[in-house]
Amino acid sequence: MAGLVYPQYPVFPGYRQPYRQLPPFYKPKQPYWKPPYKGVPGPMKPTNPLDCLDGYKWAQLKALLSQLGPEFGLGRRFTKEVGVQVNPRVDACIQCSLGPRTLKNCKGGPFLFHAVPGQHAGLGIIAPVRFPRTTAVYSRLSDRRLFTLPTPTYGGKKEGGTQMDPVEEDLLLKRPTFQFLEQKYGFFQCKDCQIRWESAYVWCVSGTNKVYFKQFCHKCQKGHNPYYVESIECKRCKKAWCSCPERRHIDLKRPHCQDLCGRCKGQRLSCDKTFSFKYII
């Protein structure tokens, strides 16, 4: 309209342009999530409102929705979510956002997981989570009975005298036999090279002095079994967990073997930090 009412060229040549009314100034309303102009930050609105939640609340929300049903999930359909366990000290619901399926339950294992009422009550999350670790066979924390498997009866009958199912009999026959090894201290001698050495990495069958692995001479590279094997234990109290009143006792003839005990008071190694356990299938 301003172009139609007022001419675009001046009326008198050589004279300045006539006064021209500006078009009406409309000040558009800025959305509240955008800054009014550059240089001054305004309140921003996140693209996804659920991004405001922290990791813990986000995992709790997803776990709660997963309990209601699969149609209440927050992710896309036909997609899979994978939870990666990084650190055992991290909370279970932060490690994996799959609700109660945080860790798989191994049937028959010594570490069974049960839902414990606590801070995750109502969500069905397993807490606390126990992570099995390897324990030394000669440690006080271990139990020899846990390392023995029941011997299968190949006669085809159970203890009660009833006939066994052929499927169960096949499973017993296919079950692997474990041989648990125990670390001991051994003394070696090579007669060809006239060399003697000691080693604390002698793996014997648990409860016996039967050596499972041979050690090679560093000169002739021949495998040898130790001529003498002894347990890594205190030389005074004869226990893997030292109970002597003295803080330290050293055998001057073999100080290295004494230091490898690791359970005497004041020693360099401690029982909780020593892991020496192997098994062979």
Curated annotation (Swiss-Prot):
List, in alphabetical order, the GO biological process terms annotated in this UniProt record: negative regulation of translation; oocyte maturation; translation
CC annotations in GO:
cytoplasm; cytoplasmic ribonucleoprotein granule
Q: Which GO terms describe its molecular function?
A: mRNA 3'-UTR binding; zinc ion binding
Keywords from the named record = Cytoplasm, Developmental protein, Differentiation, Metal-binding, Oogenesis, RNA-binding, Zinc, Zinc-finger
Q: Which domain of life is it from?
A: Eukaryota
Q: Which InterPro entries does the record match to this protein?
A: Zar1, ZAR1/RTP1-5-like_Znf-3CxxC
Question: For this UniProt entry, what is the primary localization, expressed as one broad class?
Answer: cytoplasm
Positions of 3CxxC-type zinc fingers: 183-267
Q: Give the UniProt subcellular location, in the record's own words.
A: Cytoplasm, Cytoplasmic ribonucleoprotein granule
Q: In which tissues is it expressed?
A: Expressed in oocytes.
Q: How does the record describe its quaternary structure?
A: Component of a cytoplasmic ribonucleoprotein complex together with eif4enif1/4E-T and cpeb1.
Domain comment in the entry:
Disordered regions undergo liquid-liquid phase separation (LLPS) for the formation of membraneless compartments that store maternal mRNAs in oocytes. The 3CxxC-type mediates binding to the 3'-UTR of mRNAs.
Q: What does this protein do?
A: mRNA-binding protein required for maternal mRNA storage, translation and degradation during oocyte maturation. Controls timing of meiosis during oogenesis. Probably promotes formation of some phase-separated membraneless compartment that stores maternal mRNAs in oocytes: acts by undergoing liquid-liquid phase separation upon binding to maternal mRNAs. Binds to the 3'-UTR of maternal mRNAs, inhibiting their translation.
What's this protein's family per the entry? Belongs to the ZAR1 family.
Query: Would you tell me the protein name for this molecule?
Result: Protein ZAR1-like 1.S
Q: Which organism is it from?
A: Xenopus laevis (African clawed frog)
